[in-house]
């Protein structure tokens, strides 16, 4: 197992109330657990955006995928021979965007092979679920214009002794990174 599978960043509160003007941007290596001894009410924003893949327009070498963070897996290496994204559902064919929830984007195809997105892997019926973020998208494969895969979205757990309430304006964003765009630049 990786460090992100063994450790969780824990934030513990007596009672948590995030107003509409509050945005919390999480960064770091580990998945995040927000715990409350009473209630959790979120009217603001919780943001855990993963790193995008990169792109290259000249031959030779390659590109690392979007860096793993917040429990999400790294994107695949892009180059002459693209690599799959990391994680349980990592993109298998070159060039994909990373996953978040059940979504991911196919990679760009402009003189290189486009690829599969990573997929999310989770079981909502298990209250003792492992904190596993999204899988990385695969890296692009081509001779000149290639992009690496985006990193998978992070993992977040909200748990309280009382209620967890999401207000009408609440936003929880755990997007996977975009795959590197071979047409940019």
Regions found by a protein language model. Give the residues of each.
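Glycine-centric low-complexity/flexibility signal
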Residues: 1-7, 30, 39-185
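Extracellular beta-strand-rich solenoid/capping regions of secreted or surface-exposed proteins
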Residues: 2-19, 25-38
């Amino acid at each position: 197992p990786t460090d992100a599978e063994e450790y969780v960043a824990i934030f513990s509160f007596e009672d948590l109330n995030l107003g509409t003007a509050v945005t919390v941007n999480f960064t770091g290596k580990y998945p995040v657990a927000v715990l409350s001894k009473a209630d959790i009410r979120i009217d603001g924003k919780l943001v855990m955006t993963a790193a995008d893949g990169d792109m290259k327009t000249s031959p030779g070498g390659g590109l690392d995928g979007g860096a793993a963070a917040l429990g999400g897996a790294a994107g695949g290496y892009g180059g002459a021979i693209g690599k799959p994204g990391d994680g349980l559902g990592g993109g298998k064919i070159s060039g994909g965007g990373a996953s978040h929830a059940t979504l991911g984007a196919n990679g760009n195809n402009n003189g290189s092979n486009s690829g599969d997105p990573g997929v999310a892997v989770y079981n909502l019926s298990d209250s003792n679920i492992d904190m596993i973020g999204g899988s990385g998208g695969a890296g692009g494969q081509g001779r000149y214009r290639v992009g690496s895969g985006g990193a998978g979205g992070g993992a977040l757990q909200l748990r309280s002794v009382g209620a967890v309430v999401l207000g009408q304006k609440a936003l929880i964003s755990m997007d996977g990174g975009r795959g590197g765009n071979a047409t940019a630049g």
